[in-house]
Amino acid sequence: MSVNGSARPTSEAAPAAATAGSPERRYRQDPLWIRVPLILTGVAIVGLLIVVPVANVFYQALARGFGTYWHNLFDDPDTRQAIKLTLIVAPVSVALNVSFGIAAAWAVTRFRFPGRTFLVTLIDLPFAISPVVAGLMFVLLFGLQGYLGPWLHSRGVQIIFALPGLILATTFVTLPFVARELIPVMEALGTDEEAAALSLGADGWQMFWRVTLPNIKWALLYGVILCNARAMGEFGAVYVVSGHIAGQTDTMPLRVQKLFDEYNNPGSFAVASLLTSLALVTLLAKVWLERKARLERKTGELAAGVLAGAIPPRLIDPLETP
């Protein structure tokens, strides 16, 4: 077993990896005239549609030097406010979706009740509705001409064209991410461990923190990462409910669009590069989480195999690392 919790079979088990049905063997059996065009096509598509545009964003942002880049990002008060607002709206929306996602996943996987299937369908509704339509729904509900707008306005509460509206719209469009990651995991886990914890005297909170949460942690973190990435880049719904007021309700995506409309290309590319950087950080975090989850799962399977006698301990190399 390696020091970081992973394990690999030694050379004695190596022939097993070269079986006829393994992916490596199938890959080697594919003709060269099939492999090369497919690989080149995949690389070309990724390069032209992803790598080149992303690289161009950073090139355009830094084309006039780092001093101009810094000025465009942090010396413009409207841009500073857009960055600040984005860094407020995204975490708050993620926190709300974590609470909702855990509650929804728990209700769907631990209880059977009338309308359960309908609830699962409703969780996916934000994926099907256009973000612009979602924003319009909140305007019609909470705007000054909406159903609840006059009542809220008479009590000094403003939702549309203010921070609460931005959070509400962002939370809506990112609603399914956490719940959709947790539901299949919690269904697969079942309730045996939780029932055992309760039978040993644990209360509900102890059961959740010590049994349920450790089992769903990777799915929860994965959902949080996806939710945060979407929240920071949301444009359509936020555009409708924000009023597009510079220095007040503009988030970073809205600021990019406004600077571009004003022919301030260096400024728009600077803000776009910051958004892209945040997206790349999110991608790296996603890859890291997937690797950690895969290693943890593999370690558990190997340990279970050794305990069951299916894998001889001598086939586990204590020094080899992945």
Which residue stretches match the model-derived regions?
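Transmembrane alpha-helices and adjacent helix-loop boundaries
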Residues: A128-G135
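Hydrophobic alpha-helical transmembrane segments of multipass integral membrane proteins
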Residues: L48, K84, I88-F100, A104, ...
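Transmembrane-helix boundary motif in ABC transporter permease subunits
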Residues: D30, N72, P91-D124, L136, ...
